[in-house]
Amino acid sequence: MLKVAIVGASGYTGVELLRILHSHPEVAVTCVTSEQSAGRPVSSVFPSLRGRCDIVLENLEPVGIAEKVDIVFTALPHKAAMEVVPTFMKMGKDVIDLSADYRIHDADTYGKWYEPHLNPELLPEAVYGIPELRRAEIAEASLIANPGCYPTSVILGLAPLLKGKVIDPRSIIVDAASGTSGAGRGAKVDNLYCEVNEGFRAYGVGGVHRHIPEIEQELSLLAGSPLNITFTPHLVPMDRGILSTIYSQTAGSVKAADLIALYEAFYDGEPFVRVLPEGVLPSTAHVRGSNFCDIGITVDQRTGRVIVISAIDNLVKGASGQAVQNMNLMCGLPETLGLDLLPVFP
């Protein structure tokens, strides 16, 4: 039985980790931390856990935590994670970091989009944790940079096209819409009910969203050369889910049926990627609460553009579910263990 710590358990990704790991047959969550709620049962912070998970939240003391667990999930904001991850690593613990701190390979790029990196020497050790693309590397890693939610939906949506050199990599435009849980649990005026309800708005417009360098880094690796994208995120009045609509120009004449066959071959055997039939498009309602990524593909024959639509639950495949998938690979467990989560519908 693996002993697991969740560092930063009072946010949405933290409680989602607790929900998933509670049903994992090979895991015991033995430590959960929260600076704001230390000393309280986690079920007092999240009443949904009442009677099933009443473990008491602790203060964040990395050495003490490392002494009593086998693996650590860090569900902290950026910067806070890189302040504690080195201690866990030095004490020989495998770490799955859900922040942005180890996703970007280049320290200067990270510094440009976030702030100076505190331990750039760890960046080469961190494996970007998309199992569908990095399964062998993840299995050998000690530090996983769990991907962001938007990047997961975009990268899985584009990987077959870029690897297959079907599209012009300079032509990529992404419109992505997320539920409000993607902004975290902290109190913000922009996320109040009256600010969000009955509205639909873009934000981070003009190439300034912090997920852009992460997306471009991974897409460039798939394409085999550097590329830039136009990425515009949107906030929609729902709790969870991401729908990414991805546009790109084809290198020649293509049919939707041929592209679907390409995707089916690329993701053959993947337990959590569902390529939809021609004429069927994804909905966030059909992946809610699950670790699935649903992908639909069509072609605008008038303009020669491929349109890919991908849907994920931002808290599961976009965060905590993918983190557990990575843990399974790191620990030599069946990849789907604890993740047989049917979507919640309606």
From Swiss-Prot:
Domain of life of the organism encoding this protein: Bacteria
An annotated Gene Ontology molecular function: NAD binding
Pathway the protein takes part in: Amino-acid biosynthesis; L-arginine biosynthesis; N(2)-acetyl-L-ornithine from L-glutamate: step 3/4
Family matches, as InterPro entries: AGPR_AS, AGPR_type-1, NAD(P)-bd_dom_sf, NAGSA_dehydrogenase, Semialdehyde_DH_NAD-bd
Keywords: Amino-acid biosynthesis, Arginine biosynthesis, Cytoplasm, NADP, Oxidoreductase
Family: Belongs to the NAGSA dehydrogenase family. Type 1 subfamily.
Designated name of the protein: N-acetyl-gamma-glutamyl-phosphate reductase
Source organism per UniProt: Geobacter sp. (strain M21)
Gene that produces this protein: argC
